[in-house]
């Protein structure tokens, strides 16, 4: 069967280092994990060069939204808030990440596959850099507001509503090789393909929270499955 096009995409930005980067920025991984991600790009490009496979590569910022695995920052915060558990924040919480709603990311990938010249690389970013501590506080505030105004959602709480506040935040030691900022420049996909993220972060985070509130059965099923690993 003929291969129409290979699209390789990932969410790890440590490939470049810690400055604002474009698609032409030299790859500069800082950890074994990010080196493995960089290697995947290099393999795709090597196959394209050697065997003339049609390909595109996308590199995106941190995704969030429905079906995000519960161990990741935003769903972990949501899960812990509902249970009244502490919210671990690395370092002082001042690490900065760019956040991209998953639906916007999917539309960007589709646009690359459908319209981009073969062999081109595109950064897909959310134009939404935030400190981790601000993400945590916004999530606390949003859940508290929903629970106060829509009482039917309180059935998913295993703690008192009064416990949903900033006292849940606890600062933990930052992990080795953790970059202070992942700064992505998605100008190329905006100017060449006309893509732009449609979801403001405050809208996206509320949609995400509501999805998790409405899909606790999925969350529990995933957590139960991972506990048997």
Where is each model-derived feature located?
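C-terminal substrate-binding subdomain of Rossmann-fold SDR/epimerase-dehydratase oxidoreductases
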Residues: 75, 81-229
């Amino acid at each position: 069967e003929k291969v129409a096009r290979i699209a390789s995409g990932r969410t790890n930005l440590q490939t470049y280092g810690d400055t604002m980067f474009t698609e032409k920025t030299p790859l500069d991984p800082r950890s074994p994990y990010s080196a493995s991600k960089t290697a995947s790009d290099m393999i795709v490009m090597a196959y394209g060069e050697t065997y003339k496979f049609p390909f595109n590569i996308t590199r995106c910022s941190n995704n969030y939204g429905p079906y995000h695995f519960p161990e990741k920052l935003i769903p972990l915060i949501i899960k812990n808030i509902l249970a009244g558990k502490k919210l671990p924040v690395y370092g002082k919480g001042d690490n900065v990440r760019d956040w991209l709603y998953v639906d916007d990311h999917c539309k960007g990938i589709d646009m690359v596959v459908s319209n981009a010249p073969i062999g081109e690389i595109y950064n897909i970013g959310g134009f939404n850099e935030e400190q981790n501590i601000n993400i945590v506080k916004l999530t606390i505030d949003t859940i508290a507001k929903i629970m106060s105004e829509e009482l039917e959602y309180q059935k998913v709480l295993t703690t008192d509503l009064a416990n949903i506040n900033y006292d849940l935040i606890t600062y933990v030691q930052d992990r080795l090789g953790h970059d202070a900022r992942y700064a992505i420049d998605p100008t190329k996909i905006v100017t060449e393909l006309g893509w732009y993220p449609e979801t403001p972060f405050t809208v996206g985070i509320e949609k995400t929270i509501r999805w998790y509130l409405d899909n606790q059965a999925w969350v529990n099923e995933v957590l139960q499955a991972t506990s048997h690993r």
